[in-house]
Amino acid sequence: MSAIMRIHAREVLDSRGNPTIQIEVESEYGYGSAMVPSGASTGEKEAKELRDKGTKYEKNWYGGKGVQTAVDNVNNIIAPKIEGYDVLDQRAIDYEMIKLDGTEFKEKLGANAILGVSLAVAKAAADELNIPLYRYVGGTNGFKLPVPMLNVINGGEHASNTVDFQEFLIMPIGAKTFKEAMQVANKVFHNLKDLLASQGHSTAVGDEGGFAPDLKSHEEVLDFIVSAIKKAGYEPSKKGDKAVAIAIDAASSELFDKKSKTYTFKKLKKAILTKQPGFENLGKVKVEYSSDELVEYFKDLFKKYPIISLEDGFSEHDWDAFTKLNNSVGATHQIMGDDLVTTNPKFIKKAIETKAINSVLIKLNQIGTLSETMDAIEMAHKAGMTCVVSHRSGETEDTTIADLAVALNTGQIKTGSISRTDRVAKYNRLLVIEEELGIVASYEGIQVFHNLKVK
């Protein structure tokens, strides 16, 4: 047994300049540190991060967004309870914190407080054993490098532009190694920048490092991406050695009106109504959709473009629409739930029963402990679903999710573009892991979609 000797929390800053929490854990022979990210578009069923609004710390940071209350909870409540535990007893530690909080969504102590301790404990254990985190969590079975979903154009809550869908991503599925996938991404990203600039569009980037131009439709976004893939010397396709496929995170909960049960492309609508330059003659463009109309809209996009994955195509309250689309195209396309299931086995179980999705996005801070995250992945995998480990829009230089993507054999990772250090840090970590694994390293490419018949 190697006891945990010290747990300490502090406030640090995330990639948006907002406070977040950092946890340090020291055992007799090991040390681990973890920083917790936060999201901009969040599911209602996520575990709750604790912020300082309404507390005595409210004025410490802009908008009451400090996390000193969560820091206090770690230092004064969690630490005294967990110090003395064997650092290798991950699940017992996680369960003890869940019990200590006592609420379904961890709103008492804060999911940010609990997750930070959970991850720092795992990293301290790995350090104690003198092995990397992916080896500690995954054992000898952690050898698959994930296919990256690389954000190339930001919209929605992640950018101040006219694009309503939150993320447009590329997937280098024809690559043979993770390093080659990064080389593909590098070429497509910079060719996209050149194409945007050549047509007078902004090449400033959004929260996750993708470009954030004012474009007139989602189709125009996709046309630019297809052109960039071709200009880089690859094929916008779902098959072949040169294939680069496209993925979309629509984040449609942000577009949904609960009363009317309709979806509105709000940013495009505003640009048209205010006659933003270039949008003056778009008055007849459709900006409002019923659930059924949005199902057909996505199916039409799937026919026109090499899209292989769609995340949160509908609101987290619109389960029927998810099921309808999945029943229609789920055999050939990855239909992924984020806000719908929030990395929670309770909601993943419902998604399995209703056949709403065939893939689960995995965000550790949606559920709040490493053990529960592993349970969510196991449940999804047993049901034949794919899983994608994901960052959040408010990130840090912490690279834990890179190790976990390998350790847990998810096969896919979504962690932003190849700009902004908070995003690139994860890719750099994966490049190191691939080199460490040597000849046993595996990059599956298109084969990662084991549950699809890709056409």
Curated annotation (Swiss-Prot):
Compartments (UniProt record): Cytoplasm; Secreted; Cell surface
Root EC class: lyase
Pathway(s): Carbohydrate degradation; glycolysis; pyruvate from D-glyceraldehyde 3-phosphate: step 4/5
Obligatory cofactor(s): Mg(2+)
Superkingdom, natural source: Bacteria
Reaction(s) catalysed by this chain's protein: (2R)-2-phosphoglycerate = phosphoenolpyruvate + H2O
Cofactor note: Binds a second Mg(2+) ion via substrate during catalysis.
Active-site positions on this chain: E208 (proton donor), K363 (proton acceptor)
UniProt keyword list: Cytoplasm, Glycolysis, Lyase, Magnesium, Metal-binding, Secreted
A GO cellular component annotation in the UniProt record: phosphopyruvate hydratase complex
MF annotations from Gene Ontology: magnesium ion binding; phosphopyruvate hydratase activity
Predominant location category: cytoplasm
InterPro entries: Enolase (IPR000941), Enolase-like_C_sf (IPR036849), Enolase-like_N (IPR029017), Enolase_C (IPR020810), Enolase_CS (IPR020809), Enolase_N (IPR020811)
Binding positions ((2R)-2-phosphoglycerate): Q166, K363, R392, S393, K414
Entries under Pfam families matching the protein: Enolase_C (PF00113), Enolase_N (PF03952)
GO biological process, one term: glycolytic process
Coiled-coil positions: none
Keyword set includes Mitochondrion: no
NCBIfam families per UniProt: eno
Function according to Swiss-Prot or TrEMBL: Catalyzes the reversible conversion of 2-phosphoglycerate (2-PG) into phosphoenolpyruvate (PEP). It is essential for the degradation of carbohydrates via glycolysis.
Protein family membership: Belongs to the enolase family.
Cross-referenced HAMAP family: Enolase
Annotated protein name in UniProt: Enolase
Upper taxonomic lineage: Bacteria, Bacillati, Mycoplasmatota, Mycoplasmoidales, Metamycoplasmataceae
